[in-house]
A protein has these predicted regions:
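Terminal leader/tail segments of proteins
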Residues: 1-267
């Protein structure tokens, strides 16, 4: 489970079926070492290169990478007058990154004098992920953010009967007895259906793409039928990553005007 979401031990509603108690404030922080080399580039320059990064887990938030200030290219950054305050960490100072003719305003922050309860943040800085051009985990370029080591994606073959219908209609968009079931930490199960079991004649590429750091880049389709157009109602991962690799070529459905019927497992 993720530490800070769903029923994780550092979430706002930790699990009840446990034999322990977690003492401490309602908003909890946990920092631990990140085990691999991390780099960030901007404007053709390597702004950050470190093997000493840490991950900060914070109640209700995704993990945030922090890196030693000494591992950031000092010649590419300058302090600004911008400051923010966090009641759990203290007052943050900010830096702008300049590389060639590219500028990322207030892209880096740090807590020069963190609160006593988070004193271990001193000497570390965080980056706004999208402010940099590229991020690398060892030599692999990252799609989306750095992965949460406590987040899982599992894909399993299933023989459940799955049918996708246009709501308030008998129009069937897809039907299969051979779906894949994708379970992801903190999210509801999703069924992915073979493309051969989907009414391709009702689908039109929408041009929308989204990036998930756990599954890869998704492509979307809109459904047009019975005079109705359901935008971005179908998606697929053409080149899924890691534990999601099995869903390549499969499609999933979600839209307020669609009903996904799932039958009981066969006896």
């Amino acid at each position: 489970m993720s530490l800070t979401f769903s029923d994780g031990p550092l979430s706002g509603r930790p699990p009840e079926r446990v034999n322990y108690r977690i003492e401490g404030p309602a908003h909890k922080l946990l920092m631990h070492d990140f085990p691999r080399r991390v780099r960030a580039t901007f404007g053709g320059q390597t702004v950050l290169d470190t093997t000493r990064a840490v991950l900060l887990h914070e109640t209700g938030l995704p993990p945030q990478l922090y890196v030693p200030v000494d591992d950031i290219r000092a010649d590419l950054i300058r302090p600004t007058d911008h400051h923010t305050y966090c009641p759990f960490k203290g007052t943050a100072s900010y830096w702008t990154v300049t590389a060639g003719d590219q500028v990322a305003e207030n892209a880096i922050w740090a807590y020069p004098e963190p609160n006593a309860e988070s004193h271990w943040l001193q000497g570390y800085a965080g980056f706004y992920w999208d402010a940099m051009d590229e991020w690398y985990d060892e030599d692999e370029r990252l799609e989306g953010r750095l992965r949460d080591p406590y987040h899982r994606v599992d894909v399993r073959r299933s023989s459940r009967h799955v049918r996708v219908l246009l709501r308030d209609s008998d129009t069937v968009l897809a039907e299969t007895d051979r779906p894949l079931l994708l379970s992801e930490t903190g999210l509801p199960n999703r069924f992915y259906l073979p493309a051969a079991d989907v009414r391709q004649d009702l689908l039109e590429p929408s041009g929308t793409h989204t990036v998930c750091q756990y599954k890869g880049t998704a492509s979307y389709w809109s459904v047009t039928t019975n005079g109705r157009k359901l935008t971005d109602a179908v998606w697929s991962y053409p080149r899924p990553e890691g534990d999601s690799a099995a869903v390549s070529g499969y499609l999933s459905f979600r839209h307020d005007d669609l009903t996904v019927e799932v039958g009981s497992p066969p006896a």
